[in-house]
Structure formats: structure tokens, C-alpha cells
């Protein structure tokens, strides 16, 4: 299971409660505490909760459980003016791309470490070791628009991340650790996917490695996130998780227009999903005799909301697939520690022979 290391002082600041309370409540949002030492806590989270891959996502859930913030988190989207033109040659290689811009950021080294950790956890989980989805992070101030997502020959060269000299795409796949590890995602391709800007600067060779020219540092104020892959649904999920995390970091989110032939679409999609409100099922599944008003309050403590007869589920909650999942969220919002276990009466009483 994935593990994330969190600085407790940062988490105190993000949630607004002391460390003692944090350590008491972490298990009640579904996290297992692995260790506490040197001012940090290592927590294990379920792969179906990738939004817990940073302290920002964990703090968001804790603020709900503690009643500090209720209901859907709100992230405003504005037009960034950034566009990506997609090469039709990638239709059989790695056809999907979606992006988001986050501006107004003030990053420290721990922010960057956590973003990279989230990136890698998403690669391994939803990304299926980058075969299905891969993510790139870029300093947008170093990019000249528009951008191009192209299929280029194996002989094309650029300077990969953390390298000082140019390497061809073919050499990267054969001679670098990351290339050998993930080259299987491009087996059989006659052209390789590359993201470049209008000046020819390489942002990324997905799903292998980013370019060195657009690396993110503590001086970066505006990040461009690209998500490429073979499955649109998984790519949209991953981008929603990353966009909401950048929103929690204080970033102003901007849309990116993706142009593929005559098709145009705007990403990311962070609109909440809707599911039926079924208070009777909640009572049946949880065993809690809650009024509908109490059910709604528990839903809001789990950072969801209710409108009419619909439960509004934040887009980053990719784990909620069924009404039973909503019932589980009600139990978490109610407080697992408040639920008293009862042994069911047996209708098969034993007897001595």
C-alpha cells in the first residue's frame, strides 16, 4: 500500500488543531499510522484514495471530519489561454492528453516533494505503471505557447530531466534507468509522443521523462500539469486529483484547450458527480438510526454535499462508485469511534449433546 510522510507542524497549520488531535483522528478517515518520529508521521493509505497522497488532501478530509469545513470544496476555474495541438499520428500510440494550469503558487521544497510523491503514486496506481496514464509537471513561465503534442521519430533528441546533454528518444529508452523501466508502454510504436512548445523546447517525452528546461523549482509560480495516456476516463480522474491538490495549495486553476483535428475540448473536468440520496439504504447498511437531516450532515462532514435528492461527490473522489460507498462515507462522517458494536442475537442456539 502507498505510504506518505507528513510533517506534523505543516498538518497542524493546514487543519488548525494540535498534533495530539491529529494523531487521534487520522485513523478515522481511513489512514493507518505506520510510525511517528522526528516531528513527522508516516501514514499508509488505500490505493483507492489517491487524494490522500499529500498533506493537503489529508488536511481537507480532517477539516471535514472535525467540523471545521463542511460540504464540497470549491475550486474556481478560469481560462488560462493555453492550448495544446494534438498530432493525429499519436492516435494509435498514446492518444489522450489533458492539462491544467495553476498560478499564484508559493512552493517550498516540501510542496515539491509531495507533488512528486503524488505523481509517482498515481503512476503506480491509476496509471498502471504509466502504461495507462502518466503525469508531467512544468514551470509554465519557461514555455512559449501554443503547445504541441506530437509523434516524433526515435532519432529526435533533447535534454532529459537531470541530464546535461541531449539524448535521442531511442537512447533514452535503452540507456537510462527510467527508459528501460517504462519502455514497454511504447512497444511497437513507430513514432514516440513528445510535448513541445512553439519555440521547440521539449516539455516531456511521456510516459518516460520530462525535459530539463521546464523543471519545477521553489521559484516556480505557475505550473502546467499534463496528463497523457491511453484511457480518457483514467486520465480525467488523475487530472482532477492533481487539479484539486493544486487548488488546496492555493493555486488559481486555469483551463487548457485541447485541439485534435476538428475536435476541441477544455480540461480539466472538476465538476462534482451526482448520485441518488438514499437515507433508507444508509440506515440499513450502517445500522445507525439517523434522520435524513442527520444523514445529510454526515455527508457534508465527508466533504460531499446534497442538493435536492442528489448527493454531490467531489471529482477527486474516484473511489465512490455505488450508493453503498456513500453509506460508508456517512458512517465516517458520523464518527467510527461513536459506533457501538453489537453482537447479533443467534437464531441457532447451541445445546449440549
Stretches found by the model and what they are:
Residues 2-99, 114, 131, 275-278, ...:
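Extended, well-folded interaction surfaces typified by the phenylalanyl-tRNA synthetase beta subunit core
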Residues 78, 82-100, 104-118, 122-270:
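Mobile "lid/hinge" segments at catalytic clefts and subdomain interfaces of large enzymes
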